[in-house]
């Protein structure tokens, strides 16, 4: 660990007490490329990350990546990668993954996670359709579409086995899609009965559906923290990211981002 980062780790609390202003710190030693903070994300996932009309990557996660890079005195580089391959590229293709990804025990076996927000899923259904599940209990007997690689696949299978079947109800049929938009298209085509999607993204899907889709759930389903994933053992980068989040919370930028993207803060 560089002496500069050791000093940062020791004195970050004092720095925040003295000033709530955002002040950059020296770059962590274990970035893949000196002066560049490389971040993996799947850029099909608004409001977390998506391409705008000028082909720029915009959203919550690019904004967080830029702020962390600024704190490291590095340039952010965003690398578009399939969601199911994101964890595998940490420490090889990029320094971190920031992509609306939940913190789960399975992922933590492969990488270290720093929680940065809290969210859960919403259930999307055809507006006015016969299937309007309010909770996960009402997904029994429903064909549910969702993006491949999400933690909800395991959660739904477990709920189907341990609640639906044990209560004499039909199983949940799970269909995975490469991307969330493909799951939405399947719902519009009536090939599935409902879609499970992270709440902020679900709202955007509904808003863009021209009144054809609606959120049927009445509360968040499977709420979990979202995490910034880095290579196991990269303590320098972990401490630098934690210091960035502490600074952003102290100067109000964190609260503004969380509010802007309809998430919940996490301590």
Regions found by a protein language model. Give the residues of each.
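Beta->alpha turn/N-cap motifs
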Residues: 40-45, 79-84, 93-104, 119, ...
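Periplasmic-binding protein-like
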Residues: 43, 118-125, 207-246, 261-267
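Short loop->beta-strand "edge-of-pocket" segments that line small-molecule binding or catalytic clefts
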Residues: 37-41, 136-154
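Ligand-binding cleft/hinge of the Venus flytrap
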Residues: 65-72, 152-176, 206-210
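Extracytoplasmic small-molecule ligand-binding "clamshell" domains
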Residues: 29-100, 176, 240, 251, ...
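Short helix-loop capping/hinge motifs at secondary-structure junctions, enriched
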Residues: 30, 128-135, 233-239
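A ligand-binding cleft/hinge motif common to bilobed small-molecule-binding domains
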Residues: 84-88, 101-109, 155-159, 186-222
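Acidic, polar ligand-binding/catalytic clefts
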Residues: 66, 70, 75-138, 219-220
């Amino acid at each position: 660990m560089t002496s500069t980062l050791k000093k940062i780790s020791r004195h970050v609390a004092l720095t925040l007490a003295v000033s709530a202003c955002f002040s950059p710190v020296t770059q962590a030693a274990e970035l893949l490329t000196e002066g560049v903070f490389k971040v993996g994300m799947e850029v099909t996932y608004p409001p977390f990350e998506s391409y705008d009309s000028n082909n720029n990557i915009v959203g919550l996660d690019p904004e967080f990546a830029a702020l962390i890079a600024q704190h490291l005195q590095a340039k952010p580089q965003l690398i578009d990668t399939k969601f199911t391959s994101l964890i595998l590229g940490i420490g090889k293709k990029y320094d971190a993954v920031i992509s609306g990804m939940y913190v789960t025990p399975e992922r933590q076996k492969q990488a270290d996670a720093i929680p940065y927000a809290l969210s859960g899923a919403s259930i999307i259904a055809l507006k006015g359709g016969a299937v309007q599940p309010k909770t996960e209990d009402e997904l029994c007997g429903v064909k549910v579409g969702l993006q491949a690689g999400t933690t909800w696949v395991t959660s739904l299978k477990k709920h189907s086995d341990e609640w639906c079947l044990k209560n004499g109800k039909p199983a949940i049929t799970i269909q995975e899609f490469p991307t969330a938009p493909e799951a939405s298209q399947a719902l519009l085509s009536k090939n599935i009965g409902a879609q499970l999607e992270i709440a902020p993204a679900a709202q955007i899907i509904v808003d863009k559906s021209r009144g054809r889709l609606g959120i049927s759930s009445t509360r968040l389903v499977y709420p979990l923290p979202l995490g910034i994933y880095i290579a196991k053992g990269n303590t320098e980068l972990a401490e630098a990211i934690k210091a960035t989040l502490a600074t952003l919370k102290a100067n109000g930028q964190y609260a503004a981002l969380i509010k802007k993207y309809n998430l919940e803060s996490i301590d």
